[in-house]
Regions:
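Residue-level recognition of strand-loop junctions within catalytic nucleotide-signaling folds
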Residues: 18, 245-248
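Conserved glycine-rich beta-strand-loop-beta hairpin in the small C-terminal domain of fold type I
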Residues: 240-242
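ATP-binding N-lobe of GHMP and related small-molecule kinases
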Residues: 1-92, 110, 160
Length: 276
């Protein structure tokens, strides 16, 4: 039996850094959505666990226990032969490694005909629990507190200037680690336009330090700002991937083509959010 599991990209529509624990973990308040761009994990029962990596971003991806996919496979309780089709750029702020680990846990559950192994997800990384659900949520704490959120559909263009950003270094550059959270009670958004208007009043607290450390992030944001029909733009996670929101997928597709043509070295994709 072979199973294929999609590992969708995680987009931080907002990311407020609200504190830091004594153990060094940062406290976050973030609206998270998942989109129809991502990696794919293929799993087959085997006598010994092994990982191979294919796809446009396969080069340099480790296949040993330093890869979250192999660590997730270790929680399965049985060996698997795994293939990771790496379509998302690495270290890019859209949860690629965490999404891959979560997809591996889901693949193991399907192969073993057992519930998804949720208990060990947080031990793999702060973003793995949210990626395991792959649904719109408000994520707080260090990533373990997940509250489902009803969000209107969003259409966007994702841009990564093909530079990797160190999450620890971005956090080190953050001027304040005790910033305001989102409102305790989130508003109702009757449509995408009202949602985008509200999102524009929120923040990604990691954007400014990322721009300071990595000028290419500023270049990506500037290019998105000039895209016809762009309604709001922001960096996702700790970067370097940035996104702009559009009225519909058609407009996003057109903008993505234009941006890719103007910046052939960049990773540019149009995307739509997945339903809850």
């Amino acid at each position: 039996m072979t199973v294929k599991v999609f590992a969708p990209a995680k987009i931080n529509l907002t990311l407020h850094v609200t504190g830091q624990r004594e153990d060094g973990y940062h406290l976050l308040d973030s609206l998270v959505a998942f989109v129809d761009q991502g990696d794919q994990v293929t799993a087959t029962p085997a006598t010994v666990s092994a990982l191979s990596v294919t796809g446009p971003f396969a080069q340099g991806v480790p296949t040993d226990s330093s890869n979250l996919v192999m660590l997730a496979a270790g929680l399965a309780g049985f060996p698997m032969s795994l293939t990771l089709d790496k379509r998302l750029p690495p270290a890019s702020g859209i949860g690629g490694g965490s999404a891959d680990a979560a997809a591996t846990l889901r693949a193991a559950a399907r192969l073993g005909a057992k519930p998804v192994i949720a208990e060990g997800a947080l031990s793999l990384g702060a973003d793995v629990p949210v990626c395991l659900g792959a649904k719109p949520v408000r994520m707080s704490g260090i990533g373990e507190a997940l509250t489902p959120v009803s969000m209107p559909a969003l259409h966007m263009v994702l841009v990564n200037p093909r530079v990797e950003v160190s999450t620890p270094e971005v956090f080190k550059s953050l001027e304040s680690k005790t910033n305001a959270a989102m409102p305790e009670v989130l508003p109702d958004w009757p449509d995408s336009l009202s949602f985008i208007d509200w999102l524009s009043t929120q923040r990604n607290d990691l954007e400014a330090p990322a721009v300071k450390r990595v000028p290419e992030v500023a270049a990506a944001l500037a290019a998105l700002a000039l895209a016809p029909g762009a309604q709001m733009l922001r960096m996702s996670g700790s970067g370097a991937t940035c996104f702009a929101l559009f009225e519909n997928r058609y407009t996003a597709d057109a903008a993505a083509l234009q941006l890719a043509d103007s910046n052939p070295w960049w990773w540019v994709k149009s995307a739509s959010t997945l339903p809850g």
